[in-house]
Amino acid sequence: MTTPRTVEAGSGPVQEARSIFSPATGFIRRAGFAWTCNPYLGCTFGCRYCYAMYLPQNRRPISEWGRWFAAKRNAVELAQHTAAKLRGAAVYLSSVTDPYLPIERRLHLTRGILEALLPFQPRLLVQTRGPLVVRDLDLFQQWDAIRVNVSIPTDDDAIRQTFEPKAPPLEKRWDALAALRQAGIPVGICVTPLLPLARPQAFVERLLNFAPEVLVVQEFHESGGRFGADTAPAARELAARHEGHAAAYAAVCQELRRRGAVFFEGEAGFFPPAVDEKRSRVKTICPPR
């Protein structure tokens, strides 16, 4: 892997990247994506269960995860030069960072990449927990095949603050989902991993009432040794302190099935959007695992 040259900017680190679109690997490739796109390295949301802190792209100590980011300052220029090769391809935005970190409000790297991609209409999946995503509704509405996944791992903001200390509040994410839905953009809700819940039955009811195009749930997991795929040990230890958490996951899945909900468990739910899914509003259906 080629390491981009790091330079210092007045307000923090930026990097000169050699490419902005990388061939998909791992579960993202298995899901059917050809490319990933990461405008930033690192992440300031600081999720304690994040697999990305263990990946080779993170060259900082694990203890510093959530305290830093690096912006690829030439990301938009690179996207403009290479977007044509992604015509119609499946693109995952983003795999090792969040495309809507707070700094994106000022830097506009993600928006610039979207503007470069738009004429070539790749099948785009946006993965975020950042409410800033609604800023780009005008671009999403011009896409033929798009889905925006928003992470909603719990119903309890105190739990969110424990596991995702710097991530946006849950209600702001629900507000973003509502705005996306109002704009006609297909959405996915990712309960991945499922964190401890305050009111499990009410949480299931809210998921069902919203009825996202795709619903994904996943428990804390271990991969059996594949580098970087495990849920962070610190997060598993936190979850273990909440009595009955494993049983709660099974109960949530059982209730979803009892209510006839179509949902996916784990990586099975991360698949490219279908062409014209936005306009047809046809749900992609797969039997529960």
In which residue ranges do the predicted regions lie?
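Auxiliary Fe-S-binding modules of radical SAM enzymes
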Residues: T2-E16, S22, R199-R289
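Conserved Radical SAM active-site core
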Residues: T2-R147, D156-A158, L170, Q182
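A structural motif corresponding to the C-terminal end of an alpha-helix
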Residues: A116-P122, D175-V187, A247-G266
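Conserved strand-turn element in the central/C-terminal portion of the radical SAM core barrel
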Residues: K166, A176-R199
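A short acidic, glycine-rich active-site loop
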Residues: W65-R73, A167, A235-A247
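Active-site beta-loop-alpha junctions enriched in small/polar residues
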Residues: V96-D98, R129-P131, S151-D155, T192-L194, ...
